[in-house]
Curated annotation (Swiss-Prot):
UniProt function note: Scaffold subunit of the histone acetyltransferase (HAT) Enok complex which has histone H3 acetyltransferase activity. As part of the Enok complex, associates with the Elg1 RFC-like complex and down-regulates its PCNA-unloading function to promote the G1/S transition. May also play a role in maintaining the protein levels and stability of enok.
Biased composition (Basic residues): 62-81, 796-805
Subunit structure: Component of the Enok complex composed of at least Br140, enok, Eaf6 and Ing5. As part of the Enok complex, interacts with elg1 and the Elg1 RFC-like complex.
Binding-site list for Zn(2+) 2: C303, C306, C327, C330
Name of the protein: Bromodomain-containing protein homolog
ZnF segments: PHD-type: 283-333, 394-457
Zinc finger regions, C2HC pre-PHD-type: 337-370
Underlying gene: Br140
Length: 1430
């Protein structure tokens, strides 16, 4: 049963009737009373009078016994321990809690008091008799008459720990109260039968997200929506248009026009700077509390439409809104002005009432009877009807208005001055609100409002407010009255929008209708009236908030900066912040450096400790790190992958690499430096044994060996210095060094002879394998110096023997030749006979100069006794070749030399089929020596015998006179003129033999005279150690390419049985490499020679077995045109050597003046220039056509293949005449009387335009083809051969005059694209199928899109090239954009450094290395596992 009256209305009546507490409860039987009306109202509404419960539990009298502990806590406070409760001490002592009387009672003193229910209410009498405390969120009431026993925290904690106080935190007296009985809710569960959870519906792959449009996008859209007024107006307009017979206008058209009118007016106002509202005042205060201060939780908000300034708490805004914020008046009634029902003034913060009216918030706060239904949002305003009528009848003494609104009175009891709240604010009356606590209850807060008239303003308030005197106050009141009257009378400023006519015309173009102008005038008038009715507020809600401040910002932006001071303050703030951040960054950097130094210190300390524990391991670690640093390509870093090279374990039995050495070092398997050095030597030996000499791995092994030697020496010295090297290890001497030293002492002790010279040459080759580079260089220089001295002593002996011998019939000519230039200080002439250098000098005291010259790298081997001095079967060099692959010789070359040497030893037992070319060469060697020494062969033989050249005498005596011929050659590389014999041919008739004999004597005499008349000068060699890039050829031919296979040894030259063994000197048993030559790091271009096999064929005039030759170079003669028979075309003899600084010694030996063509006697003489730039234009013309053509008649010969003496003399004379005009020391040009053309002397590094990408492959293939063909007979079709030679001559003449050779597929070239430097590339055939493998290297097939680009350049000849870049780019390029790669080393170096950008140069170098790697792969015929090009 509830109350039979309204509790709220009763409380309001009590408030008006009774002003002083206490307020008693009107319910019969309830004697409770309260100090406040709110307490009474709460009691009436919450308390259940039908089931009354005691709000405070009944206190147990102190005279009763305390309850047992099992029953709960004591209900009364225990007395102090000095006054124990009777009968209680013994029980507690028995339980072991003797101090419970004090501790328990004292502890319960707090908990034994009455814990009040926060929701319970107390009567007024009970409230007066108790004191309430808030402990941990609980209200505790203590009687004012009860004693307060105390207990310490430690004692209370000990009692709780022992269990003397149970549930110390729970309220003990009210634990059985109904409100304290909290039961856990019991869930009611019912299982639904046959219920299945369905799968989630399929969701789209993307989320739906709303993206707000920008202002520019919104300006282009239609945002206006018609309302009821617009619909009614449009309906009326359409009715009129129908009466006139016009079409109706749609709603969309009206929305478009209204939207454009609104936006154009907004744009015009913004452009003109017209303010559309009140400007924001930075010093604005809250219009409710008149305070300008704000806090983080109570900031001042400004309305975006009317610029109203209010606090959050004053206006009821619990949180700061994001974006636009409008007050309630602007939000709900933007166009219609509102009036306050509580005062006559307009403006300010409005809120709606519960009846739909408007009132000021400040009025609702100050009038006592008015309330807010929601105290958080302060709306709506209610209880206005409870205002007494007397308030409505009061007259405001400020505005003198009566009956307009409700007034409040002065707080002074004796003053009856009344005033409106807003009028008091305008007049500046003293009005204050304070929150105070209730005097009896600390938990309740009250708001006290004090409003005074100007006459009763408190004195302290006057000082704070600086209130003037009475007269000034009256004057201020009058001004406030006038201001309020002006506000009430003035109408709001309505901004009438205007749009220029041109803009109206633009808007009119957007629509199409009948009588457009009339309709536009009517709709503009309608829009203007609607804006005026809305007090100028824009019809678009978005423009309502933008229009107010936009014009102000635009105007300020035109005039200048909006706030320079604020910007300056912000700038200073950010500068200070940046400085602070910079200081923090520097501090962090210092910390980082400190920690870095700490880490470095710890590492150094660790190294010191490890060095003290195991110093040898530290030294070996340092050495191994240095070795790994030398391995820049990381070739030796990891073990060899046997899956890539399956045959590696067949050749290398003990693999070794730096990674394995590192692992062994970590496992402490190295007890000495020698063990590590042995493993390193094993690694290098494995590399040299398995890889070919022309591979990058072989060169890396050589480079690694040379760079590691000083490292081992340095580490050994450091270990010796530190005393870590054992005594037995300190004096370690290489066994090869000991052998070289011992053999050198023995050779120097023996008398000088040619045999000793040959052994010294062998010893110099043996010194190449010494490990110490410094010792190796020093020892090689010493041996070469001894060789030079010994040669000079032998030459002096020969010279004395020649002058003491009997002169022959040409002695006078020789004396003229030797004595032609008596005025010169020094004349050096070298007579080249089968590669032998013979010096004739008039100064005997030049030995020191010559020794220095030889020691600087004169690697030319003396070859004048190669045919006389033979290597015995057990050569000392054999000990050097005991390893599987000695230094300088790869496995293939070593096997080749061994097989050829064995074949040479077996040759005497087989029927000799040596071609005529070899016998002629032997006879030429003997004849050359006899001619160069004196004109008589008998005298030369005697002189040679006296000098120890017995073999020369033997060969000379065994050569028949029919094999004699002559030739004039010049050795430019040796620095002096020399006379050498040409290649003869054996005749089949006696007439030919006689003619050849007579021709020999005549030509030798002419040769002597020509050599005496021409000036001889030794040119300076600019690059002494530079490797001569020109091809070294030999005048000898392979037995399998002999032009006359029918001629046998019995017909040409009888050979003794010991000749094959004697023709294999020691220099052919070992590969002699020159360490001082200039070799590119990227490629060792294989030198070429015309001799197909330098190791087993006879000795040639050019010295094909020199230090620069290799196994690949000896096969150069096999590379040529496939249609030649037994020799090369005469036009291929020309060589453009303009790119090289010096001329090779073999250039002039193969330049011939006579070249007999065919068997009919027609002989064409071609001339080749040995100089690079010294020939004149006349000489060039002579070179461009054969000599027979210049003489305009064919040259007749007496016998088959044998020219007449007259013809030969004429050729020699012509050659001598041309040679005089040249500045370079071209003594003479060689002539050949053979029926077979001499071998082709290549032009520099020019490669033959063959599909093969490597000259080594060409050489080997050509040699195989030649071997398969055998001794093919010569063709007699002279006309066809002459035509082929003419075409070849024309082609090579074009090459010699600067034209490029023909480009063929599978050639390495330099390619040029626009915007890129010259780049290495490979020419490929567009028809290359997929999976094509060339010499074991897979080549890619061109893509279809690349082939489709061919149609873009149909007007010219282009080549498909594949660049060696990272992406393997394809391109079609013409011939003028391509240069052959690998022909000229200077050209290659120029292309490598052509680009100015370091990154491009690095990329070009990398591509160049890839191209060379590809070349080495296709040249690798032993299957070393080449990788695909892509």
């Amino acid at each position: 049963m509830g109350l039979d009256f309204d509790a709220v209305e009763y409380c309001k009546g009590v408030k008006t009737q009774q002003s002083q507490p206490p307020f008693a409860c009107p319910v019969r039987g309830c004697d409770r009373s309260y100090k406040t009306i709110m307490g009474l109202q709460y009691h009436l509404m919450k308390y259940d009078h039908d089931n009354p419960q005691p709000l405070t539990p009944v206190l147990t009298p102190s005279r009763k016994k305390a309850r047992s502990r099992s029953g709960g806590h004591h209900s009364t406070p225990r007395p102090h321990k000095d006054h124990p409760t009777p009968g209680g001490g013994g029980a507690e002592a028995r339980n072991g809690c003797s101090s419970a009387s004090a501790g328990g009672g004292s502890a319960s003193g707090v908990s034994a008091r009455q814990y009040a229910n926060p929701e319970s209410l107390v009567s007024y009498n009970e409230e007066e008799a108790t004191v309430t405390f808030n402990l941990d969120g609980k209200s505790v009431r203590l009687g004012i008459d009860d004693a307060l026993p105390l207990v310490e925290d430690e004692e209370f904690a000990a009692l709780v720990a022992r269990g003397c106080i149970l549930n110390a935190d729970a309220p003990p007296l009210e634990e059985n109260a109904p409100w304290a009985r909290v039961q856990v809710p019991v869930a009611r569960v019912a299982e639904i039968p046959d219920y299945r959870v369905s799968d989630a519906p399929p969701r789209p792959l993307a989320y739906y997200r709303f993206i707000e449009k920008s202002l520019e996008e919104l300006d282009g859209e239609v945002e206006y929506d018609v309302d009821e007024e617009d619909s009614a107006w449009l309906e009326h307009m359409n009715e009129e248009r129908q009466r006139l017979g016009l079409n109706a206008v749609g709603i969309d058209t009206m929305e478009l026009l209204m939207d454009r009118l609104e936006k154009e007016s907004h744009f015009q106002a913004a452009a003109n700077g017209t303010p559309t509202g009140v400007e924001v005042d930075d010093d604005a205060v809250c219009c409710i509390c008149l305070d300008g201060e704000c806090q983080n939780t109570n900031v001042i908000l400004f309305c975006d439409m009317c610029n109203l300034a209010v606090h959050q708490d004053c206006y009821g805004v619990p949180y700061i809104p994001e974006g636009q914020w409008l007050c309630r008046r602007c939000l709900q009634s933007p166009s219609k002005p509102v009036n306050c029902v509580l005062c006559p003034n307009a403006g300010g913060a409005f809120k709606q009432t519960d009846h739909g009216q408007w009132a000021h918030v400040v009025c609702a706060l100050w009038i006592p009877e008015v309330r807010f239904a929601n105290t958080v949002f302060l709306e709506p305003i209610d209880s206005i009807e409870t205002i007494p009528p007397a308030r409505w009848r009061l007259t405001c003494y400020v505005c003198k208005e009566k009956g307009l609104g409700a007034c409040i009175q002065c707080h002074r009891n004796s003053c009856y001055a009344a005033f409106h709240v807003t009028c008091a604010q305008q007049a500046g009356l003293y009005m204050t609100m304070d929150t105070v606590k209730d005097g009896h209850n600390d938990s309740s807060m009250h708001v006290q409002k004090f409003a005074y008239c100007h006459a009763h303003t408190p004195a302290d308030a006057k000082l704070k407010m600086n209130v003037p005197d009475f007269e000034d106050t009256r004057h201020k009141m009058k001004e406030a009255r006038k201001a309020l009257a002006k506000k009430r009378s003035t109408a709001p400023v309505v901004l009438i929008p205007t749009i220029p006519p041109d803009r109206v015309q633009e808007i009119a173009t957007m629509v199409t209708m009948q009588r457009k102008k009339e309709f536009l005038d009517r709709i503009i008038a309608y829009w203007t009236l609607k804006r005026h009715y809305r007090n100028g507020v824009p019809l678009l809600r978005r423009l309502q908030s933008q229009g107010n401040n936009h014009g102000v910002i635009q105007r300020n932006g035109i005039e200048g900066s909006p706030d320079t001071g604020e910007l300056y303050r912000q700038l200073k703030y950010w500068q200070c912040l940046r400085q602070d951040l910079e200081r923090a960054r520097l501090l962090c950097e210092l910390v980082r450096k400190r920690e870095k130094l700490k880490v470095a210190f710890v590492r150094i300390s660790e190294e010191v400790v490890m060095l003290q524990l195991n110093p040898l391991e530290a030294a070996l670690n340092k050495l191994l790190d240095a070795l790994e640093a030398r391995d820049s390509m990381q070739i030796f870093r990891e073990p060899v992958d046997t899956s890539e090279v399956p045959d590696y374990t067949d050749i290398v039995k003990q693999p070794m690499d730096l990674g394995t050495m590192r692992a062994k070092l970590k496992e402490c398997q190295y007890n000495s430096l020698e063990q590590l050095e042995a493993d390193f030597d094993l690694m290098i030996q494995n590399c040299l044994a398995y890889n070919n000499k022309d591979t990058v791995f072989y060169r890396a092994g050589i480079r690694m060996r040379d760079q590691a030697a000083p490292l081992f020496v340095q580490v050994r010295k450091e270990l010796q210095r530190d005393g870590l090297l054992a005594r037995s290890q300190r004096y370690h001497v290489d066994h090869v060094e000991a052998e070289v030293e011992q053999e050198l002492r023995l050779l120097l002790a023996a008398p000088a002879s040619e045999g000793i010279v040959q052994k010294l040459l062998i010893l110099a080759d043996k010194s190449q394998v010494l490990k110490n580079p410094t010792y190796r260089t020093k020892k090689i220089k010493q041996i070469r110096l001894e060789i030079s001295r010994m040669r000079k002593s032998l030459q002096k002996a020969r010279f004395a023997a020649r002058h003491s011998s009997h002169a022959n019939q040409s002695q006078s000519d020789d004396e003229d030749t030797l004595g032609g230039s008596p005025s010169k200080k020094r004349t050096r002439k070298r007579f080249n006979s089968s590669g032998v250098d013979m010096e004739l000098g008039h100064d005997d005291d030049d030995e020191e100069e010559d020794s220095d010259e030889d020691s600087m790298g004169e690697d030319t081997v003396s070859k004048d006794l190669l045919n006389s001095t033979q290597t015995p079967p057990c050569s000392p060099i054999k000990s050097l070749n005991n390893s599987s692959s000695p230094v300088g010789i790869n496995r293939r070359t070593a096997i080749l030399l061994t097989r050829k040497a064995q074949a040479a030893l077996k040759r005497p037992s087989e029927p000799l089929t040596t071609p005529v070319k070899e016998e002629q060469h032997n006879s030429q060697s003997s004849n050359t020596q006899s001619t160069s020494g004196s004109s008589s062969s008998v005298t030369t033989a005697a002189t040679a015998a006296s000098s120890g050249a017995g073999t020369l005498n033997h060969v000379l005596s065994s050569a028949p006179p029919t094999a004699s011929s002559f030739a004039l050659t010049q050795n430019n590389s040796s620095g002096g003129g020399a006379l050498a014999s040409g290649t003869g041919i054996g005749g089949s008739s006696s007439a030919g033999t006689a003619a050849a004999a007579s021709l020999t004597s005549t030509a030798l005499a002419m040769n002597s005279k020509l050599s005496a008349n021409l000036p001889v000068k030794s040119p300076k060699r600019p690059g002494r150690y530079r490797r001569v890039p020109e091809v070294r050829h030999s005048s000898s031919m392979s037995p399998k390419k002999s032009p006359n296979p029918a001629v046998t040894v019995s017909q040409a030259l009888p050979m003794p049985e010991t000749l094959p063994f004697e023709r294999i000197p020691d220099s052919f048993r070992v590969y002699r490499a020159n360490n001082q030559r200039d070799v590119s790091d990227s490629d060792d271009a294989p030198s070429q020679s015309s001799s197909p096999c330098s190791s087993c064929s006879d000795f040639s005039m050019s010295g094909s077995c020199s230090d620069f030759d290799s196994d690949e170079a000896s096969e150069g003669d096999a590379d040529g045109d496939p249609d030649r028979d037994g020799g090369r075309s005469r036009s291929e003899e020309r060589d453009s050597t303009s790119q090289e600084g010096t001329t090779d010694a073999m250039d002039m030996q193969h330049a011939s003046l006579n070249n007999v063509q065919g068997n009919n006697g027609n002989m064409a003489i071609s001339s080749s220039s040995g100089g690079s730039g010294g020939s004149s234009s006349e000489d060039d013309e002579l070179e461009e056509r054969p000599l027979s053509a210049r003489q305009n008649k064919p040259m007749k010969v007496g016998t088959r293949g044998t020219p007449t003496p007259t013809t030969m003399a004429r050729a020699v004379a012509l050659s001598a005449g041309r040679g005089r005009g040249k500045r370079r020391s071209n003594l003479s040009e060689s002539t050949s009387s053979t029926a077979t053309p001499p071998p082709l002397r290549r032009a520099g590094k020019l490669r033959s335009a063959t599909p093969n990408a490597s000259p080594l492959v060409n050489n080997i293939k050509a040699r195989r083809n030649t071997t398969a063909a055998g001794s093919a007979p010569l063709t007699n079709n002279n006309r066809s051969k002459h035509s082929e030679d003419s075409a070849s001559s024309e082609r090579h003449n074009n090459h010699s005059h600067g034209q490029k050779p023909a480009l063929e597929p599978l050639q390495l070239v330099w390619a040029k694209c626009r915007g890129y430097p010259w780049y290495p590339a490979l020419i490929l055939d567009p028809k290359t199928p997929k999976g094509f493998v060339y010499n074991g290297v897979p080549l890619p097939a061109p893509p279809t899109d690349v082939l489709a680009l061919r149609k873009n350049c149909l007007d010219e000849i282009v080549f498909l090239v594949l660049f060696f870049d990272v992406k393997r780019t394809w391109q079609w390029l013409p011939a003028n954009k391509l240069d052959i790669l690998g022909i000229d080393k200077q050209l290659d170096q120029q292309k490598l450094v052509e680009s100015r950008k370091p990154a491009e140069r690095k990329a070009v170098k990398k591509a160049y290395q890839d191209a060379l790697h590809y070349q080495s792969q296709v040249s690798d015929l032993e299957g070393q596992g080449p990788d695909p090009i892509m």
